Structure formats: C-alpha cells, structure tokens
Amino acid sequence: MKKRNFSAEFKRESAQLVVDQKYTVADAAKAMDVGLSTMTRWVKQLRDERQGKTPKASPITPEQIEIRKLRKKLQRIEMENEILKRLL
C-alpha cells in the first residue's frame, strides 16, 4: 500500500476539527479519512505548537513555519558574520 502524504494545511485543518470545533479524535479521523493514530499525532502537534513548544515533526501552523525559516536565516547570517570576523 502506498504511503499517503498530506500537506501542512490539511494536517492543521484536520487537527483544528478536534481542538477548535470539539470533534472527537475518532470522528475527525473518520471525516478526514485518516487513521486514528495519525489524527492523534496531528492534534498533539497542533496543541504543542499553540503552547509555543518547538515541534519535532514538520510544523503545522504558519507561525511555526515562519519561525523555522527565520531560525535558519539567522543561523546562516551568524555563520557569515563569523567568517567575516576571521577575515578582518
């Protein structure tokens, strides 16, 4: 069986059914045609991200995506600064 890939937006919207709209995990999983353990993982990830915890998996919320991009950019700039300091 081929593994299905879901977009971050789909994961977020699916998890929001449970977190924001008070669906049960089982009902949301059935409505979105995903496994119960998959839905449980997405709900946990969304709740963690909303509490400000750094996700171990791919980020769900747009804010977490932006934070990840900014952290990478900051790391690159800091590395460039270190290289320039050594040259001077």
UniProtKB/Swiss-Prot annotation:
InterPro entries, from UniProt? Homeodomain-like_sf, RD_transcriptional_regulator, Transposase_8
GO BP term, pick one: DNA transposition
Annotated TM spans: none
GO: which molecular function terms? DNA binding; transposase activity
Instruction: Provide the alphabetized UniProt keywords.
Output: DNA recombination, DNA-binding, Transposable element, Transposition
Highest taxon of the lineage: Bacteria
Q: What is the role of the protein in this entry?
A: Involved in the transposition of the insertion sequence IS911.
> PANTHER family under this entry?
PROTEIN DISTAL ANTENNA, TRANSPOSASE INSN FOR INSERTION SEQUENCE ELEMENT IS911A-RELATED
Sequence similarity? Belongs to the transposase 8 family.
Q: What is this protein called?
A: Putative transposase InsN for insertion sequence element IS911B
Organism name: Escherichia coli (strain K12)
